[in-house]
Amino acid sequence: MLILGLNGNVSAAGADVVPNLNELYMHDAAATLVRDGVLVAAVEEERLNRIKKTTKFPSNAIRECLAAAGAKPADVDAIAYYFPEDFFDDIFQQLYTEHPSVPTRYSREMILERLRVDLGWAAPPDILHYVPHHLAHAMSTYYRSGMREALVVVMDGAGERNCTTIYRSDGAELFEIASYPVPKSLGMFYLYGTRHLGYGFGDEYKVMGLAPYGDPSTYRDVFSTLYSLGPNGTYELIPRGGVVFRMTTILREHGLQPRRRGEPFTQAHMDFAASVQETTEQIAMHVIGYWARSTGLRNLAFGGGVAHNSTLNGRILTSGLFDEVFVHPASHDAGSSEGAALVVARERGERVWPLPRLTNASLGPDLGDVDSLERTLKSWSPLVDVERPDDIVEATAHLLAAGEAIGWAHGRSEFGPRALGNRSILADARPKENQTRINAMVKKRESFRPFAPVVTAEAAGDYFDLPETVGHHDFMSFVVQVRADRRELLGAVTHVDGSARVQVVTEETNPRFHRLVTRFGELTGTPVLLNTSFNNHAEPIVQSVDDVLTSYLTTSLDVLVIEDFVVRRRTELPLALEDFTIGFRPVTRLVRRLADVSAGRPGAPEVSHEIYLDHTSGPRATISAAMYELLTHADGVTPLGSLGIELTGELLTELYDLWQGRFVTVAPVGDGAGSAP
């Protein structure tokens, strides 16, 4: 039986289902394909449409999942969706009242339309099944844990009516034993704390990285007024049901002004972040601890967006409450697409247990065969030199040992927000300056944010204090302590509090990556690398060969290693761009504005030009008149140098900056860079 699991909303690639759709509506779009209970393929739509945390319908992800399975739409027996139908339709009804010009249509009709229009799939209405949200989360994390009897905890921003649901399993079925209503949401509590620090939805991990620089005792008394812990794992957020909306007011009354985006961080901001993290941990541990003790269950499967708080997970690991803890690599909403598929499989009589523990998250599309890869690399030859060493792992290990920062792309991409050795940026984990160096070269992000280490399973205990509780460190899910005698050595990956979000790689789960870390250890004496996601600040993790080359060419990484090839820049950008085509993403928009010419203002009206990405929180940039003219002539087919526009150095630099910000696409002639905006 072949079952397709989906999440995301029904927006088409170039437009939202209603104007200015909120980023919280059906985020983290993804598709998952399950065959006879086995996870065949899974990929987030953001990897393909290049919009972080996209809400768009996952048409591209569906296409890639089917391709990975060698299947056609007609082979699919059922489609599972990660929220109930009436809940989804109620959301649409609310949106229609806010946008009366939008025709009233509902989810089943619109999902089937997207399948037909985007994929040519005339799916029958009864192929579509809807699943309760938290049950989908619970199924994905429990049935991939390898556990039999377990406590299953789902914590996130919100399901239909609940923010936390507790289950227990006897090895065959999940039984719901408790739930907590949405007004008590720890996910929303953390989000509003995140917004107070000048960040937005999806930036919660930045607050987690900032927290160790702060002292939670500074504002502990203030935060203690926001919640109370009760008996039997209960708690209240104070004022009841309204803390997330009143947090800013309450904190302002205590002298804590919200930070504006782009402002420097003060110690007060760091102390505030520490308090947000501490409060979240206190409440979560109160809930999880009670249910662990009351059920007597010694195994925990933890899911939902809150389960990506790896600092909290580290605390669970050291609490002594459990013998084993499993966190799904895609615990956020993307992973619920898999859980929804498993629910439907079970409802249709398929046995989905027992399943072995998930140890490898490499479930996305690969980079193609060698011939297609060579053709693509050759098409980019005006910008890069390519060589094929006899032993790519040996060559890469020597480059890393020599201090090079490397983009590393191999095999199928990872499912979830972590780069685990298939779409990674790698560097020596020892020099402390590598943290600031990688930030400057690639990420252009806040200097306080830590990088993660990857270590071989054979050496993990020599460098990190791994708790006795089995934590399964395959997916960077847990923050642990770096051994005190190793912290100075591992300067690039040891956080300010001596911690690290460690990945342990084994020969069985990722042979090539394990061999690379092992060989680096043989050359340097330290089998630990800095491992961070392969992307710049303006994009999701890279997926395709063109994504990989684009990211490499718009950062300052020293070398790119893609499959068995070593790639280096051969010329200085942006001067060589004239031989390439310029195109546009489906969400790219160009605007020319005339200033308001009120009476009495002499002269011609002032003109300004802007480019922006038309999606929630999409960036904007002011562009020159010359750039506006260039982009209005670009068609994704004609080389830049043949457009009849004078290409000054200043104009090419401006174009390169737009490419770096992913406002435009650049492609070799013949590849097609996208249509006009």
Swiss-Prot record:
A biological process term (GO) from this entry: novobiocin biosynthetic process
GO molecular function, one term: carboxyl- or carbamoyltransferase activity
Pathway(s) the chain acts in: Antibiotic biosynthesis; novobiocin biosynthesis
Keywords: Antibiotic biosynthesis, Transferase
Family note: Belongs to the NodU/CmcH family.
Reported function: Carbamoyltransferase that mediates 3'-carbamoylation of the noviosyl ring to produce novobiocin, the final step in the novobiocin biosynthesis pathway. Novobiocincin is an aminocoumarin family antibiotic that targets bacterial DNA gyrases.
Protein name (record): Decarbamoylnovobiocin carbamoyltransferase
